[in-house]
């Protein structure tokens, strides 16, 4: 049965118009974007299959366009549309960061980092550079790693902080495994970076560990070096 043969109340687009986008499932929202299905499958079937294979909506939208193109039910046009949606969402959250105080609005920082980096398959280490009023100056990627780890040199972190004239910084990195719990190496790295930054009078305000499951704050857990 085609979606056009369904009762109007069950069709994704009509349901959205009647009840708003929040009433739709991930698959229904995705189906509206995709518009058409494929031989033997409705567009909703295709959307559900894409979500099932990816594991989640976040993982699906984090895939590169070259990978999306090869997914059943997608082609260059639809893959590009999905990539555009993901990028617009990232930019929307990024817009909030320059006007947000990193200390009084931590959720804006967490949301942006989780969307932009939580689904990455490689580890990335970031430095959020702040001024004397804790306003964001810049976000620098200071290290990239393999599927499981990255190598961070304190001198590179210090150079990035000084380059941005930062008074304080927030360190962040993702865990591709999906577990946002910090490792022993993360704890040791935080100690070393805290000491190195203190030598140039830059304060380490937090270290955030990001994953698709959540975000762990060293500051909230009391793990920052004294």
Swiss-Prot record:
An example of a GO molecular function for this protein is: metallopeptidase activity
Binding positions (Zn(2+)) = 173, 175, 186
Q: Which InterPro entries match?
A: MPN, RadC_JAB, RuvA_2-like, UPF0758, UPF0758_CS, UPF0758_N
Swiss-Prot/TrEMBL GO biological process terms: proteolysis
Q: Does the keyword Nucleus apply?
A: no
**Which Pfam families does the record cross-reference, listed alphabetically?**
RadC, UPF0758_N
Q: What are the protein's UniProt keywords?
A: Hydrolase, Metal-binding, Metalloprotease, Protease, Zinc
Per the record, the similarity remark reads: Belongs to the UPF0758 family.
Please report the name of this protein according to its UniProt entry: UPF0758 protein LHK_01907
Q: Which organism is it from?
A: Laribacter hongkongensis (strain HLHK9)
């Amino acid at each position: 049965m085609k979606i056009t043969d369904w009762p109007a109340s069950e069709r994704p687009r009509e349901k959205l118009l009647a009840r708003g986008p929040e009433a739709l499932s991930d698959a229904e929202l995705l189906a509206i974007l995709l518009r058409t299905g494929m031989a033997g499958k409705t567009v909703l079937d295709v959307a559900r299959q894409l979500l099932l294979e990816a594991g989640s909506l976040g993982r699906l939208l984090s895939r590169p366009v070259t990978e999306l193109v090869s997914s059943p039910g997608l082609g260059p046009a639809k893959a590009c549309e999905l990539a555009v949606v993901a990028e617009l969402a990232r930019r929307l959250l990024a817009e909030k960061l320059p006007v947000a105080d990193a200390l009084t609005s931590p959720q804006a920082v967490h949301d942006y980092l989780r969307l932009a980096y939580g689904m990455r398959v490689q580890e990335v280490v970031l430095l959020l550079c702040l001024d004397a009023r804790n306003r964001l100056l810049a976000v620098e990627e200071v290290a990239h790693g393999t599927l499981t780890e990255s190598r961070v040199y304190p001198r590179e972190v210090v150079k990035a902080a000084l380059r941005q004239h930062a008074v304080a910084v927030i360190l962040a990195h993702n865990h591709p495994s999906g577990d946002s719990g910090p490792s022993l190496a993360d704890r040791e790295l935080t100690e070393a970076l805290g000491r190195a930054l203190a030598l140039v009078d830059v304060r380490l305000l937090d270290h955030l560990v990001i994953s698709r499951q959540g975000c762990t704050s060293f500051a909230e857990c009391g793990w920052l070096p004294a």
